[in-house]
Amino acid sequence: MDISGRHEEAGEYLMVAAAVHATVGTARLQSVVGMGFATSRNEPTLERTTAVVAEATDELPNPPDGPIVAERGEFYEEPEWEVEQFLGHDFKYVESIAERETVQAAHHAAYAARKLLL
């Protein structure tokens, strides 16, 4: 998953979270199964950020059978267990090349969706 727009622009916020459900091998993303999106105009905090991510994950056509994966910076480098408590779903930070590629796909999706909404 990835979030675009956690910064203030012209006195407003527009966070767009993209969740990508993908099948991955050991070294690469194999296929995208589905995507989910959610938005928030609230000032970002850990609680609000995890809420928009949970909403995007709920929008996936099929629930993921593995953990939600993100870059460390998405959740202010908080420990995985703390992020997991807010999400209510298994969570971990990126560890493999395939996970990084999946997060990169989510980044492109979140960025593009945000640009469409502006």
Which role fits each region the language model picked out?
Residues 1:
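Short hydrophobic beta-strand that contains or immediately precedes a catalytic carboxylate
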Residues 6-33:
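Acidic, metal-ligating active-site segments
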Residues 27-51:
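Acidic/glycine-enriched edge-of-secondary-structure segments
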